[in-house]
């Protein structure tokens, strides 16, 4: 079956080349988990890396939802992508195993370049995972990437406008998801085993700030099997590291101007970055300010 094409060839451990790839300090390092509603969730975890060919480790220095999600549902995933040309990508499925509040790994993380001179915060907990399956280290064609961005833009112009729908992206979300060259990554749950799959999707762009659309030509075998009406998450960021996560329903593929486009209905927008990670859209109700107190 087509669902198994790309995962059947994954290995049960990573190669030495892939292990070294995860040690690069400046790169995209994403963690894919499943939230309390059963939706995929994406978080940037800069400290994540392979400890051995079969184990991964990363450090926690802030409290966030993904740390709870990974403990509630041990099935999760990683994507490691270099930011220098040519882009190289590694995808991993893993099972969470345990945490440690004291370990050599924590000491190494806290004396690394990222935290060595920090006087306000340090990693206080290490998370460990066993590798279940891993892709080979693969190059991403910049030519194909740019072609997909072009196709998404052309196809988007053929989608019928609906000005009555409420915009769901704030000013930062509009910047992130309007500019096609901003890095974006989509996550969905593998229909075979429910592990999150993380796929680069730079070509995902906003349509009237209510939907995201993308051409599936690049990584077609991974994007084309996203189940219609399933929940997906899209992590987007600018080159200044302003980041948001969009979640919603994948409506399926439609042809516009002769171009096949995947369409995502935006239902939630999440800020995953400090100092205030949390839900942006839909907005939470704000209680009125209390200015008078009446004693009974």
PLM regions: where:
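Binding-site signature for planar aromatic cofactors or substrates
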Residues: 1-296
């Amino acid at each position: 079956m087509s669902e198994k094409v790309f995962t059947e060839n994954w290995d049960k451990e990573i190669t030495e080349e892939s292990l070294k790839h995860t040690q690069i300090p400046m790169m995209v390092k994403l963690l894919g988990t499943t939230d309390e509603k059963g939706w995929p969730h994406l978080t940037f975890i800069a400290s994540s890396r392979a400890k051995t060919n079969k184990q991964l480790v990363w450090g926690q220095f802030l409290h966030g939802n993904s740390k709870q999600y990974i403990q509630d549902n041990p099935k999760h995933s990683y994507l490691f992508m270099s930011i220098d040309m040519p882009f190289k990508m590694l995808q991993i499925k893993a099972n969470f195993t345990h945490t440690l509040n004291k370990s050599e790994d924590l000491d190494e993380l806290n004396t690394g370049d990222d935290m060595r001179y920090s006087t306000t915060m340090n990693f206080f907990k290490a998370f460990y995972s066993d590798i279940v399956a891993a892709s080979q280290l693969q190059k991403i064609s910049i030519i194909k990437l740019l072609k997909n961005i072009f196709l998404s833009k052309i196809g988007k112009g053929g989608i019928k406008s609906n000005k009555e729908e409420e915009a769901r992206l704030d000013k930062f979300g509009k910047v992130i998801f309007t500019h096609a060259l901003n890095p974006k990554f989509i996550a969905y749950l593998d229909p075979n085993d429910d592990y999150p799959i993380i796929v680069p999707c730079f070509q995902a762009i906003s349509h009237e700030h209510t939907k995201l659309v993308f051409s599936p030509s690049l990584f077609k075998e991974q994007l084309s099997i996203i189940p219609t009406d399933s929940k997906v998450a899209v992590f987007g960021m600018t080159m200044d590291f302003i980041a948001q996560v969009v979640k919603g329903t994948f409506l399926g593929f439609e042809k516009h101007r002769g171009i096949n486009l995947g369409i995502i209905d935006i239902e939630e927008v999440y800020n995953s970055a400090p100092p205030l990670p949390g839900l942006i859209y839909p907005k939470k109700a704000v209680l009125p300010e209390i200015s008078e107190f009446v004693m009974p």
